[in-house]
Amino acid sequence: MYKKIPYQTGRQLLDRFSSSDEAQALIDEELNIDDSIEALLENELYFDLVQFLAHGLPVREAIWWGAHTLDARNDVWSAMQKQCISTAKAWVKSPSEEQRRKSELFSNKLKLNCGPSWLAQAVFWNGSGSIVAPDLPNVLPDPFLYSKAVAGAINHSAALPNWDKTDEYYKKSIGIALELAKGSKA
């Protein structure tokens, strides 16, 4: 059902990040992706499910998901935070080293203290280029580092700045991810 998540079992994804004890207990070696997602949803383990989906989706889909999820908080973002989101969208549409390095500058300026800065970091860590200064020998990021940053962007924005719509935000966010996982362009 989720053609953009190229894994057989939920455990393959769950082992890629630090999940809650509840998620660990729910997803055994045999549980397929669809049933793993359903179990996390039914138990309202949204924090875990966001990490699960961020690690399951391909890089561009994951970053696109993060950008569209963060749009839900657009009323609280500063001009620079909004630029992080628009730069991430631009990178997804037309990946370039220029956009990747621009995202690095945004994440550095914002010091990873908000959801949009984590989204910018995800673009920088996407795996297409070095994560050190351009004049140094190339150092590529760990394979799923961008996933951790996308999950960080979404989960951070669910809580901060404070508000009373966290569950609604998570449900909308997860809906976007599941549509992307099915192959939609959301």
Residue ranges, per PLM feature:
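Alpha-helical transmembrane segments of helical membrane proteins, especially in multi-pass transport
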Residues: 118-128
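Short, glycine-biased loop/turn motifs at secondary-structure junctions and
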Residues: 1-112, 128-129, 134-135, 140-186
